[in-house]
């Protein structure tokens, strides 16, 4: 990694593996910037849905992505670090949790022109004192020179249960079986797509979180960060 660039921790993995929660906690603890790259795609999808745009139109969606006005923030919530996502200054965090929005994001993420449009935007989040980047190709493509790369995984069943618990009180009509089917479908699509498939970086540390709590994963990630960055991290 260039010594002129701020440090980066990448946390990749499939949906429901815990990468978002752990990433937010690390960013909050270190006072670093946070990037939820998956949210960028969901933001493009949400914006397209709000504007009734054709998700298969490469030119239209690429232009939307290129001009997307999005911001991330991490604040202290009732259960620790809590992320806030803004689209054109509107807090759309709750709107992004729907599976319809997630499906739109996965669909447009397969369009190379959209990925190119968002690549520069993602890299612009790399500012001092550092960045925690959560996604699917942070360690393989966006920040391939990151000093610490973590890849979280878990069984589809466990990830579906976690997502169900997140959504059941916030989204009406949600069912565990439907979430599991959608997760399995997204896994298949994400792992087999031609552009940036969901795979660990060759130098990533892989953590299976199936039998781990969020606190367990956070503790392990903190240990890895302290070993990697040493004096660069606040006490």
Where are these regions (language model features)?
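Small-molecule kinase domains that catalyze NTP-dependent phosphoryl transfer to phosphate-bearing small molecules
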Residues: 122-128, 136-141, 145, 170-220
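Walker A/P-loop
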Residues: 20
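N-terminal phosphate/diphosphate-binding loop that engages ATP/GTP or pyrophosphate donors
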Residues: 28-97
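ATP-dependent NMP and nucleoside kinases share a basic, alpha-helical "lid"
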Residues: 93-170
């Amino acid at each position: 990694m260039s010594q002129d660039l701020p440090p980066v921790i990448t946390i990749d993995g499939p949906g429901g593996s815990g990468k978002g929660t752990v990433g937010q906690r690390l960013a909050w603890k270190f006072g670093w910037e946070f990037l939820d790259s998956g949210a960028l795609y969901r933001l493009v999808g949400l914006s397209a849905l709000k504007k009734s745009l054709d998700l298969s139109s490469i030119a239209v969606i690429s232009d939307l992505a290129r001009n997307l006005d999005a911001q991330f923030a991490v604040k202290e919530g009732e259960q620790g670090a809590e992320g806030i996502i803004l689209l054109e200054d509107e807090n759309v965090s709750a709107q992004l949790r729907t599976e319809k929005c997630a499906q739109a994001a996965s669909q447009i993420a397969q369009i190379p022109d959209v990925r190119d449009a968002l690549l520069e935007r993602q890299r612009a989040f790399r500012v001092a004192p550092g960045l925690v980047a959560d996604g699917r190709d942070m360690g393989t493509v966006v920040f391939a020179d990151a000093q610490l790369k973590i890849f979280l995984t878990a069984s589809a069943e466990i990830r579906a249960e976690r997502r169900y618990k997140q959504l059941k009180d916030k989204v009406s009509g949600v069912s565990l079986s439907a979430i599991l089917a959608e997760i399995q479908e997204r896994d298949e699509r994400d792992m087999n797509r031609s552009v940036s498939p969901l795979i660990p970086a060759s130098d990533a540390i892989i953590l299976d979180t199936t039998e781990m709590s969020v606190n367990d994963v956070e503790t392990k990630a903190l240990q890895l960060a302290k070993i990697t960055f040493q004096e660069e991290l606040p006490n």
